[in-house]
């Protein structure tokens, strides 16, 4: 049985491939666009059966000429995830139409389809639950994800021929994101800031939040891969699910966890947030005007629906997840 992973050389996709490998699954077709060549490193430690360029894959899907038999599932992680990309034509073709074509093909072939949606569909809301009235995207990236989620809702009412699951990823961090540049997680940037400068920067006060007090639902990519595989194991489940921890933690906590994990590797003692700020190991910079009105100062996944689907595993909190991530970066990137 063959499994297809799109975006396989990317951040979440490569972690799904790795998680499949840990189960002994290697009959995997990795689909990606390697024009950004350094992404190959994410797949170098993985076992796959074949690599297929994204554009060739799309062509074969649209013409129904993919040469693989007995496809067990498609994990669709290939998309433009740059929330600051305002090229609507590109975003809608790459994130919406590509996903729609894959959905149609998977339904025709009765293949389970698990795809990446995003918490960006909620915009600046304060309630993050999988309900239409709570979804107000702030940018074309969020809209591209929102629009496809509406397609799934309509298809579910009409009746599906095979499983379809959309995961609304919250703030994901972890190994294999180094190619993402400015779109990599804050934890990634803090690690490199601290190693290079000896301190990290956080946004100052904005939108009623104090220095570094803006909060996010930070979720480890290890947990994201586990949830994807849980639904792969349960093809009877379809729908749209938030994928976060259900906890909202301050950027201050993330920065402190990153700095302290780096300090621990240097044989230095853990410091409190107050001490880190006093010693200027955490510094605050003015909130950028370009982000005002477009920035989510608070996110927290309502994971009630995920739990009702039977997923019982606990999620890493920021400290535990960042400790693991920093150790990985020290071993692989430093």
From Swiss-Prot:
GO terms under biological process: ADP-L-glycero-beta-D-manno-heptose biosynthetic process; carbohydrate metabolic process
Binding residues annotated for substrate, in chain numbering: 171, 182, 189, 203-206, 216, 295
Keyword Isomerase among record annotations: yes
InterPro entries associated with the record: Epimerase_deHydtase, Heptose_epim, NAD(P)-bd_dom_sf
Top-level taxon in the UniProt lineage: Bacteria
UniProt-listed Pfam families: Epimerase
EC number: 5.1.3.20
MF-aspect GO terms: ADP-glyceromanno-heptose 6-epimerase activity; NADP binding
Pathway stated in the Swiss-Prot or TrEMBL entry: Nucleotide-sugar biosynthesis; ADP-L-glycero-beta-D-manno-heptose biosynthesis; ADP-L-glycero-beta-D-manno-heptose from D-glycero-beta-D-manno-heptose 7-phosphate: step 4/4; Bacterial outer membrane biogenesis; LOS core biosynthesis
Residues the record marks as active site: 141, 180
CDD domains in UniProt: ADP_GME_SDR_e
Record comment regarding domains: Contains a large N-terminal NADP-binding domain, and a smaller C-terminal substrate-binding domain.
Family membership noted in the UniProt record: Belongs to the NAD(P)-dependent epimerase/dehydratase family. HldD subfamily.
Summary of subunit composition and partner proteins: Homopentamer.
Described purpose of this protein according to its UniProt entry: Catalyzes the interconversion between ADP-D-glycero-beta-D-manno-heptose and ADP-L-glycero-beta-D-manno-heptose via an epimerization at carbon 6 of the heptose.
Protein name per the record: ADP-L-glycero-D-manno-heptose-6-epimerase
Native source organism of the sequence: Neisseria meningitidis serogroup A / serotype 4A (strain DSM 15465 / Z2491)
Record gene name: hldD
């Amino acid at each position: 049985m063959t499994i297809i992973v799109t975006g396989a050389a990317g951040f979440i996709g490569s972690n799904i491939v790795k998680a499949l490998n840990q189960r002994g699954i290697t009959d995997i077709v990795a689909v990606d666009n390697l024009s950004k060549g350094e992404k190959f490193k994410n797949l170098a430690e993985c076992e796959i059966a074949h690599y297929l360029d994204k554009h060739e894959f799309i062509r074969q899907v649209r013409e129904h000429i993919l040469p693989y038999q007995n496809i067990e599932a498609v994990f669709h992680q290939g998309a433009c995830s740059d929330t600051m990309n305002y090229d609507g034509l590109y975003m809608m073709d790459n994130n919406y139409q590509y996903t729609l074509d894959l959905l149609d093909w998977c339904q025709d072939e009765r293949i389970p389809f698990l795809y990446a949606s995003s918490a960006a569909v909620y915009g600046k809301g304060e309630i993050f639950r999988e309900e239409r009235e709570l979804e107000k995207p702030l940018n074309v990236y969020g809209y591209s994800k929102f629009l496809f989620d509406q397609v799934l809702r309509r298809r579910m009412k009409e009746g599906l021929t095979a499983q379809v699951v959309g995961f609304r990823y919250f703030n994901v961090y972890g190994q294999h994101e180094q190619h993402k540049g400015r779109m990599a997680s804050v934890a990634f940037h803090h690690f490199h800031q601290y190693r290079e400068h000896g301190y990290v920067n956080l946004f100052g006060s904005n939108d009623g939040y104090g220095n570094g007090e803006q909060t996010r639902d930070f979720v480890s990519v290890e947990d994201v891969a586990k949830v994807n595989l849980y639904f792969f194991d349960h093809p009877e489940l379809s729908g749209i699910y938030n994928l976060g921890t259900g906890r909202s933690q301050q950027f201050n906590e993330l920065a402190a966890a990153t700095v302290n994990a780096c300090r621990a590797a240097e044989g230095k003692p853990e410091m409190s947030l107050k001490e880190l700020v006093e010693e200027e190991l955490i510094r605050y910079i003015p909130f950028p005007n370009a982000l005002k009105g477009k920035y989510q100062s608070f996110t927290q996944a309502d994971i009630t629906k995920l739990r009702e689907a039977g997923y019982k595993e606990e999620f890493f909190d920021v400290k535990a997840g960042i400790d693991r991530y920093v150790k990985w970066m020290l071993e692989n990137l430093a």
